[in-house]
């Protein structure tokens, strides 16, 4: 029997008997926030770990890289799983593992334990992030697209600044921040247990575990349009996540633990606010604005290093963050709404694979260059120049397509079943 539209598939709305749609959306958004907060919470703690365990900037880049690689592996293997077994089972398992990983972080006694914890954290994040993103779109396509853009930035901001504040003002910060996150994850597991399933299980779960990246026909051209922006904005995120604490301390003589977290907070906080303020704009407009403002912000932030101006650095960071938020939102809105409900997990996994590759590879290269040449400022300027080039290419590419029809107007091709 032929299906006329994607809406003919089983309903993806939460069924009665569980949490309301609004509560489900907020719960799912909070899980994304927690995933990203737990990742960025490590950033302000790197100087403490370095002082206690005596490892190099290259080791920091490696710790960052293993997390990104683990996320990528999980996305490739389990990114489509929730499209087959449902959102809840994947989220319960991934979030429970996150809680256990926080306990491992809290009692880490060396670099090896830190690396192991980051690997497990990356695997659980990769398994859960596509499922939670698809779940938000299931609940409410319009608000879910906005939540998918604002929640990662909000989590990154909160994790960085809260960890920085704990380092600065509270005892045992390398324990407290993780134990707090563990408690939050446990509460979220309970919340997911109370939530109705938005994606009915169907056959094909085992086959979905074969590592692959697949996109529905309707999303292939749009993701080519969005990819340059994704690469630019997430390369920026990698720069701040890996180098910001050391950069703030070395260039401006400020306390790395607190101000390194604040730098990440300014970047991600500006991104989150920009998403909310620009959510009614067209996807292409968002990507054009995002690439242009990101270019300007990075230029100001990098220039501030030569003049040792913290004010200019944070101003540039705020502008770059605005570019990150709007650019990422534009990319999400360009691609994800075109996917049918049973395809959303797979589509989001492709988006996050591109994003984490763009975030992880430059950060690793930067860490290697710092360790080899010992010049943080030169590396930061070169990294910034690369991000600016990526932003410029994304801007030019998006403007060149400005005369073509908006990609979000394309509808997903109907599927035929017999």
Regions found by a protein language model. Give the residues of each.
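Helix-breaking motifs and short loop linkers at transmembrane-helix boundaries and internal kinks
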Residues: 54, 86, 107-112, 171, ...
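Symmetry-related core transmembrane helices of the 12-TM Major Facilitator Superfamily/SLC fold
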Residues: 176-192, 380-397
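Helix-loop-helix hairpin linking two adjacent transmembrane segments in secondary transporters
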Residues: 147-193
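C-terminal transmembrane helical hairpin of 12-TM major facilitator-type secondary transporters
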Residues: 286-331
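A late C-terminal transmembrane helix in Major Facilitator Superfamily
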Residues: 332-378, 383-384, 394
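Transmembrane alpha-helices of Major Facilitator/SLC transporters
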Residues: 259-283
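Cytoplasmic helix-loop-helix junction between adjacent transmembrane helices
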Residues: 117-152
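Conserved MFS/SLC helix-loop-helix module at the cytosolic interface between two early adjacent transmembrane helices
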Residues: 72-111
């Amino acid at each position: 029997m032929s299906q006329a539209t994607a809406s003919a598939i089983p309903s993806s709305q939460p069924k009665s008997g569980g949490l309301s749609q609004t509560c489900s959306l907020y719960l799912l958004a909070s899980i994304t926030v927690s995933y990203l907060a737990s990742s960025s919470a490590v950033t302000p703690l790197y100087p403490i770990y370095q002082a206690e365990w005596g490892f190099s900037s290259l080791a920091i880049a490696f710790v960052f890289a293993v997390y990104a690689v683990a996320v990528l592996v999980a996305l490739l293997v389990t990114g489509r799983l929730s499209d087959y077994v449902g959102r809840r089972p994947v989220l319960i398992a991934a979030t429970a593992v996150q809680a256990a990983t926080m306990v491992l972080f809290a009692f880490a006694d060396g670099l090896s334990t830190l690396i192991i914890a980051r690997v497990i954290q990356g695997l659980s994040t990769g398994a859960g992030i596509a499922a939670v993103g698809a779940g938000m779109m299931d609940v409410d396509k319009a608000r879910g697209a906005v939540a998918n853009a604002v929640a990662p930035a909000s989590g990154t901001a909160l994790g960085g600044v809260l960890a920085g504040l704990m380092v600065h003002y509270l005892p045992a910060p390398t324990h407290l921040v993780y134990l707090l996150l563990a408690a939050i994850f446990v509460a979220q597991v309970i919340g997911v247990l109370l939530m109705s399933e938005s994606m009915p299980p169907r056959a094909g779960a085992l086959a979905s575990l074969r590592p692959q990246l697949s996109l529905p026909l309707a999303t292939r051209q749009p993701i080519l349009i969005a990819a340059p922006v994704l690469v630019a904005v997430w390369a920026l995120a990698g720069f701040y996540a890996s180098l910001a604490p050391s950069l703030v301390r070395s260039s401006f003589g400020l306390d790395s633990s607190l101000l390194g977290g604040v730098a990440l907070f300014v970047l991600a906080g500006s991104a989150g606010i920009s998403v909310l303020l620009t959510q009614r704009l067209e996807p292409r407009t968002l990507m054009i604005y995002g690439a242009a403002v990101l270019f300007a912000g990075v230029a100001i932030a990098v220039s501030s290093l030569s003049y040792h101006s913290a004010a200019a650095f944070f101003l540039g960071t705020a502008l770059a963050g605005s570019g990150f938020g709007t650019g990422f939102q534009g990319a999400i809105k360009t691609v994800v709404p075109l996917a049918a409900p049973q395809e959303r997990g797979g589509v989001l996994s492709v988006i996050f694979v591109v994003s984490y590759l763009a975030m992880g590879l430059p950060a690793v290269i930067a860490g290697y260059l710092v360790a080899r040449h010992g010049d943080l400022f030169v590396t930061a300027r070169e990294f910034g120049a690369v991000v600016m080039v990526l932003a410029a290419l994304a801007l030019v590419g998006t403007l060149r397509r400005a005369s073509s029809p908006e990609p979000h107007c394309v509808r997903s091709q109907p599927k035929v079943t017999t």
